[in-house]
A protein has these predicted regions:
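Cell-wall polysaccharide-cleaving catalytic domain and substrate-binding groove, primarily
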Residues: 1-161
């Protein structure tokens, strides 16, 4: 259905992730935790994790398994960002489409809907989820991420929109 929007979606994702941090998830670079990086085979200092390695991890662990390439670009980005950052993106998209289908079946169910209605409803569900989480010190960052995603998602375009 959609073209390969991974490079563009990854660039937008990196605008959300930034660089090196240490938080409850441990040492993280480009949104990749040390645990994930080590499982991938990275042995260096986390501060020096190459962005290319983060891109390879993102594609293999979050883009391909969630079949993001099957969805219109604005939906693919929301799905990808949520899979990467945490949440229940497939469950939320199934709820919006009123289906239990996954992969190509879910993409087909969503393809007959207005892309921007799907994006809006998806982000409403994501905000509800984020509001329910503990660690209120991260609330502003989470809300800013959603705001950026809605704005950035508007810059994505493909033939399916």
């Amino acid at each position: 259905m959609a073209t390969d929007n991974f490079p563009q979606c990854f660039d937008l994702l990196m605008q959300n992730e930034g660089g090196y941090t240490v938080d409850n998830g441990g040492r993280t670079m480009w949104g990749v935790t040390e645990t994930v990086a080590r499982a991938w085979g990275y042995v260096g200092d986390m501060k020096a994790l190459p962005k290319q390695t983060a891109m390879e991890i993102a594609k293999a662990k979050y883009w391909l398994p969630f079949h993001c390439d099957l969805f219109a670009a604005p939906i693919a980005f929301q799905l990808f960002d949520t899979a990467y950052n945490g949440g229940y993106p497939v469950k939320w998209l199934q709820s919006i489409a009123n289906t239990t289908a996954v992969g190509s079946g879910l993409a087909a169910a969503l393809s007959v809907m207005n892309v921007w209605e799907v994006v809006g409803r998806f982000n409403a569900l994501r905000l509800q989820y984020l509001a329910s989480l503990k660690q209120p010190q991260y609330a502003n960052g989470r809300m800013n991420r959603i705001s950026r995603n809605i704005t950035q998602g508007g810059s994505l375009n493909d033939a399916t929109n």
